[in-house]
């Protein structure tokens, strides 16, 4: 409440569980659930939003029906911005059942919907490449391609995520150079 009284914003960034990402609104009986917040209904999202108030709320998309989840996140959370993985959380990394092409189609459909809401889009793509050992050029190019795709679909606002010290074997100056190059291109 102190932040709100000072006219400042804070964000609840909800790291949802694997089952929330892959099996939202399905029966979870007997399924193991990795770490994160286990949310399985719009009502649970609404309770989180209400309890987080006056903070803004945001979360990542899921591994299937990405456009449907974007709509649910709008309705139930009034999500501050939408974070999408584009290339990831599919057959490519084993965290979802979509092929890469199906995943991109779902994400692009979701972006087209998000554009109608006027909310920003965050392509949390580059750091996923870095987590998987990609070089800095791949990191930068993936961020550029995601930004270009979002812009071409009509988004007016994008949140560019730039994680430092990823992967572990880099050091600060390299990360800053990588980040500055990506910002310059985007």
Regions found by a protein language model. Give the residues of each.
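Short acidic, glycine/proline-rich loop/turn micro-motifs
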Residues: 25-26, 170-172
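Short glycine/threonine-rich loop-to-helix capping motif typified by GTGT followed
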Residues: 138, 171-178
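Conserved, mostly hydrophobic/aromatic
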Residues: 186
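Acidic/histidine-rich catalytic neighborhood
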Residues: 166
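Catalytic alpha/beta active-site cores
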Residues: 1-147, 151-153, 157, 161
């Amino acid at each position: 409440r102190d932040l709100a009284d000072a006219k400042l914003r804070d964000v609840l960034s909800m790291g949802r569980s694997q089952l929330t990402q892959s099996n939202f609104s399905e029966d979870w009986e007997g399924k193991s659930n990795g770490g994160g917040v286990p949310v399985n209904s719009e009502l649970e999202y609404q309770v989180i939003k209400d309890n987080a108030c006056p903070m803004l709320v945001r979360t990542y998309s899921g591994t299937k029906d990405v456009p449907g989840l974007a709509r649910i996140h709008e309705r139930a959370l009034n999500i501050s911005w939408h974070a999408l993985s584009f290339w990831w959380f599919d057959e490519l990394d084993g965290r979802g059942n979509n092929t890469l092409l199906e995943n991109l189609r779902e994400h692009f459909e979701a972006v087209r919907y998000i554009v109608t809401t006027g909310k920003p889009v965050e392509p949390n793509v580059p750091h996923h490449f870095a987590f998987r050992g990609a070089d800095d050029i791949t990191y930068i190019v993936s961020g550029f391609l995601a930004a270009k795709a979002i812009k071409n679909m009509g988004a007016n606002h994008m949140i560019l995520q730039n994680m430092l010290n990823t992967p572990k074997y880099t050091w600060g100056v390299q990360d800053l150079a990588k980040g500055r190059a990506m910002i310059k291109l985007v």
